[in-house]
């Protein structure tokens, strides 16, 4: 996990999706860690 803007953005999004684990359950599953890693890789 590289400390970069991409990871920060991914973490904020993950936290938002993790908080309301009632409606965006499928979205949270689709963007658990793969989305964060993909965003970080793209930003790096």
Curated annotation (Swiss-Prot):
Annotated Gene Ontology cellular component terms: nucleolus; site of DNA damage
Annotated spans, Disordered: 1-44
Cellular location(s): Nucleus, Nucleolus; Chromosome
Main localization of the protein described in the UniProt heading: nucleus
Intrachain disulfide bonds: none
Biological process terms in GO annotation: negative regulation of protein ubiquitination; positive regulation of DNA repair; regulation of protein ADP-ribosylation
Compositionally biased region (Basic residues): 24-44
Keywords: Chromosome, Nucleus
Quaternary structure and partners: Interacts with KLHL15; preventing ubiquitination and degradation of RBBP8/CtIP. Interacts with PARP1.
Entry function: Micropeptide that acts as a regulator of DNA repair both by preventing KLHL15-mediated ubiquitination and degradation of RBBP8/CtIP, and by promoting the poly-ADP-ribosyltransferase activity of PARP1. Prevents KLHL15-mediated ubiquitination of RBBP8/CtIP by competitively blocking the association between KLHL15 and RBBP8/CtIP. Recruited to DNA damage sites via association with poly-ADP-ribose chains, and enhances the poly-ADP-ribosyltransferase activity of PARP1.
Name of the protein in its database record: Poly-ADP-ribosylation-amplifying and CtIP-maintaining micropeptide
Organism of this sequence: Homo sapiens (Human)
Taxonomic lineage of the native organism: Eukaryota, Metazoa, Chordata, Craniata, Vertebrata
């Amino acid at each position: 996990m590289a400390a970069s803007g991409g990871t920060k953005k991914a973490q904020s999004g993950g936290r938002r999706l993790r908080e309301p684990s009632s409606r965006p359950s499928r979205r949270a599953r689709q963007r658990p860690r793969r989305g964060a890693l993909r965003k970080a890789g793209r930003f790096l």
